[in-house]
Amino acid sequence: MAMPTNHAILSASSSHRWLECPPSAKLCAELPDTSSEYAQEGTDAHALCEHRLKALLGRETTDPTENLTYYNEEMERCAVEYATYAYEQVKKAKVACNDPIVLIEQKLDFSRWVPEGFGTGDCVIVADGTLSVIDFKYGKGVEVRAENNPQMMLYALGALELFDGIYDISAVNMIIFQPRRDNISEYAISKEELLRWANEILTPTAQLAANGDGDFKAGKHCRFCKVRATCRKLAEYNLALARYDFEPPATLDNIEIAAILAKADELVSWVTDVKEYALRQALSGVSYDGFKVVEGRSNRKYTDENEVVEAVKSAGYDPYEHSVLGITAMTSLLGKKKFNELLGGLIEKPQGKPTLVSISDKRPAIHTANEDFKEEK
């Protein structure tokens, strides 16, 4: 979804949070929105996707690239991949329906279930019996899944509001297209299942959230919450690990270590957020017992690189480093096709450094030395 400039209190993009923790919605609404480079980059990518898809469909469109701050070859490639994929979905829809409806960047109103609820669907395809909603995600930090994704389900409800009376829709397809994670995630649900969820779970929870009622609940949904640094429930949730009732003996057993690992990343992230929040507050005049603000370490830098170059050259030395461009920079220089032609046979991908992750991670487990030894025996 493109980043809207005006947010509803109960937005689709934050629904994963307020459905789990209803009172967080009003608390977050009281704080100002803060933009980031990642958010602006995503906005640029969505604008380019819209243009590329409209062009494929033969619709009137204006190339936005000269106005995109973060436009680069990777963004272009991702936009073309998205447009091509969405266009293929349109062609599939035409097999079942001669003239499917295709909406791009369509405002979707789901306020029948969520007070003032609306969002923007990147691509909505409506054909006889089937509604498809495609959402483009440019982020690469977290892989987004379509299965039981509340944001996608809200978009689907908004699309049903527009078209269910015109088309006899019975099935809903929800698709996440996330090219920088090589992730295309699909989830199909019947209209009846979607409406049952909307009436039995969504509506009552949304009403609680709109009123600031309900119980606070900490969990993975807290990751992008605006009040996570000062939330008491999240603090209790994370500090519970510090109060873990470790039993003798003096060393932890595997079960205790697994319990710590399950929360370690969230704990580290939360502590970082608290420290950043405290620094901002301290810089604005807040005092914390036992702490003070000091000047951090800094590195020396040249005041004028051009003068440095001239001075070093005049002394008879070469001021520049000389090394082969890295793979990403070389791909940008040559283009992906030329890069593969010239250097495809000279590229290898060594094994990655072993890392311990949750069992839910999609990557296959590697064989440890101990397992190999057991197999040999």
Regions found by a protein language model. Name each.
Residues 40, 98-207:
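Mg2+/Mn2+-dependent nuclease catalytic core
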Residues 53-57, 138-141, 156-164, 207-210, ...:
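Hydrophobic/aromatic-lined pockets within catalytic cores
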